Amino acid sequence: MGSGQWHVEKRSTFRNDSFVREYGIVPETGCLSIIVLGASGDLAKKKTFPALFNLYRQGFLNPDEVHIFGYARTKISDEELRDRIRGYLVDEKNAEQAEALSKFLQLIKYVSGPYDAEEGFQRLDKAISEHEISKNSTEGSSRRLFYLALPPSVYPSVCKMIKTCCMNKSDLGGWTRIVVEKPFGKDLESAEQLSSQIGELFDESQIYRIDHYLGKELVQNMLVLRFANRFFLPLWNRDNIENVQIVFREDFGTEGRGGYFDEYGIIRDIIQNHLLQVLCLVAMEKPISLKPEHIRDEKVKVLQSVVPISDDEVVLGQYEGYRDDDTVPNDSNTPTFATTILRIHNERWEGVPFILKAGKALNSRKAEIRIQFKDVPGDIFRCQKQGRNEFVIRLQPSEAMYMKLTVKQPGLDMNTVQSELDLSYGQRYQGVAIPEAYERLILDTIKGDQQHFVRRDELKVAWEIFTPLLHRIDKGEVKSIPYKPGSRGPKEADQLLEKAGYLQTHGYIWIPPTL
């Protein structure tokens, strides 16, 4: 945009308080017990506890109501758990944060025990009940939120123990909810088996299948962008859009997680869940309301419209050196890179390729959505070689969105040049802290809002799309192509994009605006 001074406007915001009333998402009071199962693991330390601390600092967790319980097999004390997570929460040199941290850590109690025996969960229930008795009076309810920061293999036994020993028993009302992390199975059969095992114990309204991509700021912005802006409505279809890319790139490899990653691969790890969820929001029809079930109904409909994936529209890759990890088999075919084209058979999207691309050890780190529009018919300026209009939504890092367009280059001649209209969140929303995805989603579970969580039928259809391809990969029928770390990935992937109709703008680089 130029190098001059930026003027940051102050604009009014509209807070839709009627939303919570209309859709039954109402604030609750009373004792809130948050139980982090797998409390000594990396996920809990790096994501769950930091999200809880940030919610506490912002006033969303009332210290007069909430208590946090860690549960794991590791035999440690309350203070040892606090010491383990302390360094992941704040820089203690900040006096204000250090004071908040000290108060937050005092809310945490630890219980150790196995995941498949009642004895440990009975002690956990006793600790929770003591907290509830100390906090509750004649008013209020008892709410229990179980966050399973655990591998899916132990979900069935843990859920059975929760159901047997740890359900909310208050006569004053309240609820018991569970949060489960991906991966939800490895294919359709295992996902359905897992869903059945959990579904026999809990109602769907109690189950929150978390996909942290649905908590990202610009992913949550998709419905607002699409359905609250008039100029997008007539353009968002096959008559105007040439192709859609949803991209996830990392500039590092598996880094010590090779054995775990090799069981799943990049499609199970990223594409079948994160990128497919983004596709739903880009491609779905307008829901009749913002009720969570209405939104999730439309996501299921668009997934049901995806046609089977053709091997001709898939490129797999594996970066050189991946098998050097001692935990990875020498003959592994597991892809660390994949580009696959999905096609949606409906009136809006017939003929438009949705290109889902993800990879590790590439030349950059970013996640973005690229909506590329069709060429202008009757190009009187002869500028099509400069590139098409493209609407780009940068999910990470440095959240932003920009529209690539052709304009007249300043000067006496009639020359055209590619430029952009852009919105960089760091520049536009200075001083506004953008919440982490886990903060939003944990708060949603407390509120009882399932809009940003995956429903069972949605999960089933997602696996139906990818399971046939995954089984062919597992059998070695689709091979991974070697690529150099730090590259764009296999050259065959670029050839597939070109075949699908994607036109790259050579020489154009978007530069985020600076103050």
Curated annotation (Swiss-Prot):
User: Which pathway is it part of?
Assistant: Carbohydrate degradation; pentose phosphate pathway; D-ribulose 5-phosphate from D-glucose 6-phosphate (oxidative stage): step 1/3
| Name of the protein in its database record | Glucose-6-phosphate 1-dehydrogenase 6, cytoplasmic
Check the record and name the NCBIfam families matching this protein. zwf (TIGR00871)
Q: Name one Pfam family in it.
A: G6PD_C
SUPFAM superfamilies assigned to the protein according to its UniProt record, in alphabetical order: Glyceraldehyde-3-phosphate dehydrogenase-like, C-terminal domain (SSF55347), NAD(P)-binding Rossmann-fold domains (SSF51735)
Give GO BP annotations, semicolon-separated.
Answer: glucose metabolic process; pentose-phosphate shunt, oxidative branch
Q: How does its activity get regulated? A: Regulated by metabolites.
Q: Where in the cell is it found?
A: Cytoplasm, Cytosol
Amino-acid positions noted as binding D-glucose 6-phosphate in the UniProt annotation, renumbered to this chain: K182, H212, Y213, L214, G215, K216, E250, D269, K360, R365, Q396
Q: Is Membrane found in the keyword set? A: no
What family is this? Belongs to the glucose-6-phosphate dehydrogenase family.
Expressed, tissue-wise, as follows:
Expressed in roots, leaves, stems, buds, flowers and siliques.
What is the reaction catalyzed?
Answer: D-glucose 6-phosphate + NADP(+) = 6-phospho-D-glucono-1,5-lactone + NADPH + H(+)
* Keywords attached to this entry: Carbohydrate metabolism, Cytoplasm, Glucose metabolism, NADP, Oxidoreductase
Q: Oligomeric state and partners?
A: Forms homodimer.
Which positions are annotated as binding NADP(+) 1?
Answer: G38, A39, S40, G41, D42, L43, A44, K45, R73, Y155, K182
GO CC annotation: what is one? cytosol
| Record-linked PANTHER family | GLUCOSE-6-PHOSPHATE 1-DEHYDROGENASE, GLUCOSE-6-PHOSPHATE 1-DEHYDROGENASE G6PD
Q: Which organism is it from?
A: Arabidopsis thaliana
Q: What does this protein do?
A: Catalyzes the rate-limiting step of the oxidative pentose-phosphate pathway, which represents a route for the dissimilation of carbohydrates besides glycolysis. The main function of this enzyme is to provide reducing power (NADPH) and pentose phosphates for fatty acid and nucleic acid synthesis which are involved in membrane synthesis and cell division.
| Other known facts | There are 6 glucose-6-phosphate 1-dehydrogenase genes in A.thaliana.
Q: Catalytic residues?
A: H274 (proton acceptor)
Q: Per the UniProt record, which EC number(s) apply here?
A: 1.1.1.49
Q: Could you say which residues bind NADP(+) 2 here?
A: K357, K366, R370, R394, Y402, M403, K404, D422, L423, S424, R488, W510
UniProt GO molecular function: glucose-6-phosphate dehydrogenase activity; NADP binding
